[in-house]
Amino acid sequence: MIFNIGIDVVEVDRFKDMKRFDEFLKRVFTSCELEYIKQKRYNPETIAGYFAAKEAVAKALSTGVVFCFKDIEIQKGKTGCPMVKLYNRAEALCFELGIKNIVVSISHQKSVAVAVAIAEK
């Protein structure tokens, strides 16, 4: 059963030259996400897509509870599809709400990235 849906759209240009903004990257992304971003040579579409996915997940959990961006990790599944791993407050919130799964989809063009997250009970 669907608990909630979140969506986010971001401009890719906001994430150009992000390699120079190391502090921002370290504040928003987990070490696993940063490793993937480095493998992709700091591709702004990749960074924008991951950022949009984190925002979409946060919106799908829209309860007013604030948590750190690093509490939401976007991973690549075996088939290459994005998967969500939660930590700390985000993980605890899902447990409290009875959320069993969060699915996420990411897409991007040259100028925008979009992500949709569905929280399921």
Curated annotation (Swiss-Prot):
What catalytic activity is recorded?
apo-[ACP] + CoA = holo-[ACP] + adenosine 3',5'-bisphosphate + H(+)
**Which biological process annotations from GO are given for this protein?**
fatty acid biosynthetic process
Q: Which cofactor does it need?
A: Mg(2+)
What is one term from the GO cellular component aspect held by the record?
Answer: cytoplasm
Transmembrane portions of the chain: none
GO molecular function, a single term: magnesium ion binding
Q: Where in the cell is it found?
A: Cytoplasm
Which amino acid positions bind Mg(2+), per UniProt?
8, 55
Cystine pairs? none
Q: Which UniProt keywords apply?
A: Cytoplasm, Fatty acid biosynthesis, Fatty acid metabolism, Lipid biosynthesis, Lipid metabolism, Magnesium, Metal-binding, Transferase
Metal-binding found in the keyword field: yes
* Source organism, top-level taxon: Bacteria
Q: Name one Pfam family in it.
A: ACPS
Q: Which family does it belong to?
A: Belongs to the P-Pant transferase superfamily. AcpS family.
Q: What is this protein called?
A: Holo-[acyl-carrier-protein] synthase
- In the UniProt record, the gene name given for this protein reads acpS
